[in-house]
Amino acid sequence: MEKKDMLYEGKAKKIFGTDDKDTVVVYYKDDATAFNGEKKGTIEEKGVMNNSITSMLFELLEKKGVKTHFIEKINEREQLCKKVEIVPLEVIVRNIAAGSMAKRLGLSEGRKLDTTVFEISYKNDDLNDPLINDYHAVAIGLTTFEELKEMYSIAEKVNNTLKEFFDEQGIILVDFKIEIGRFGGELLLADEISPDTCRLWDKKTGEKLDKDRFRRDMGNVKEAYMEILKRVNK
């Protein structure tokens, strides 16, 4: 595999082409952003940690029957992945009230929800990734109802697998967001699963072990990511 020119640079990753039209190299950066890019910073070694965490979690999910874009970890910062066409939606899965949902609905952070909540947001930086519903997504041509049904099914499988896995590591999976890509007529889990994209709380202490530490200036951000890596890597 030969790495080629950069195809795209996002907030947390760079995507490079390869000599195979169906694969890309994903490079994990140390850059950190919050509030749709309004807050910017750097977390030392974040890219290294998130690459490792995502690689291990994607391998776990593959074993549990969730198809992903992940092929292999190349080095400490890079993965080889299938070149998917990203559906311009984020699927957000919430097990416990926190973050924007708690604020929006006037719920106390940490409240256990009576059922898992699934939301979608439109991936559009100019619009600050607004929450939309299924009908919006279909009406403006982002997806179909059939595809959405499959996306929610993937999200549910990911949630069930990771909730159980993290619980065994003494971690509560509060919520997370995923992206999904089209590849060869299939939908694949894409992007990453890491403390950048999940809320993860210590089961005993309630300590936040995710990007909320950066968002809220809580300190010890690198240490929190390292703790997640340590537990995932048990």
From Swiss-Prot:
The keyword Zinc does not apply. It catalyses: 5-amino-1-(5-phospho-D-ribosyl)imidazole-4-carboxylate + L-aspartate + ATP = (2S)-2-[5-amino-1-(5-phospho-beta-D-ribosyl)imidazole-4-carboxamido]succinate + ADP + phosphate + 2 H(+). InterPro entries: SAICAR_synt/ADE2_N, SAICAR_synt_PurC, SAICAR_synth, SAICAR_synthetase, SAICAR_synthetase_CS. GO terms for biological process: 'de novo' IMP biosynthetic process; cobalamin biosynthetic process. One of its GO terms (molecular function) is phosphoribosylaminoimidazolesuccinocarboxamide synthase activity. Gene3D superfamilies: ATP-grasp fold, B domain, Phosphorylase Kinase, domain 1. It holds the Pfam family SAICAR_synt. Its EC number is 6.3.2.6. SUPFAM superfamilies: SAICAR synthase-like. CDD domains: SAICAR_synt_PurC (cd01415). Signal peptide: none annotated. Keywords: ATP-binding, Ligase, Nucleotide-binding, Purine biosynthesis. It is an enzyme of class 6 (ligase). Pathway: Purine metabolism; IMP biosynthesis via de novo pathway; 5-amino-1-(5-phospho-D-ribosyl)imidazole-4-carboxamide from 5-amino-1-(5-phospho-D-ribosyl)imidazole-4-carboxylate: step 1/2. Belongs to the SAICAR synthetase family. PANTHER family: MULTIFUNCTIONAL PROTEIN ADE2, SI:DKEY-6E2.2. NCBIfam families: purC (TIGR00081). This is Phosphoribosylaminoimidazole-succinocarboxamide synthase. The gene is purC.
